[in-house]
Amino acid sequence: MQNPIATVETFLNALQEQDFDTAENALAQNLVYQNVGMPTIYGRNRAMKLFRSMQGRAGFEVKIHRSAADGAAVLNERTDVLTFGPLRVQFWVCGVFEVHDGRITLWRDYFDYLDIFKATVRGLLGMVVPSLRAKL
């Protein structure tokens, strides 16, 4: 069984690669997935339905800057990128995960909506002036 940090990093990298089988295997059936300020998603099946529905329509990239664990809890600071066709939205995220029996039971992300707004504006400008596109 992997340590909790490795489980979380394997999961995020699998999402980036659209390896949904690996991503699903990292999640517990009773997953709680929350982007703070948005509706909470309960259950692995619902979360995976969301991720799979974006295949071919949106992309996800991740750069993990640092991770720390205390028992089952994993905290990470990372940069996430969401792509929608030529639109690239890159922003900072702090993630909180809980891993039990090798599977993620909690995934809670914190981010600043102003940063998302600025990233969206930069992404829109980058569609017109490619040198303005954010890069990981």
Q: Where are the language model's segments positioned?
A:
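Residue-level detection of beta-strand scaffold positions
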Residues: 10-11, 22, 31, 76, ...
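Short helix-capping and inter-helix turn/linker motifs at the boundaries of alpha-helical repeat units
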Residues: 1-2
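Short acidic-aromatic low-complexity motifs
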Residues: 5-26
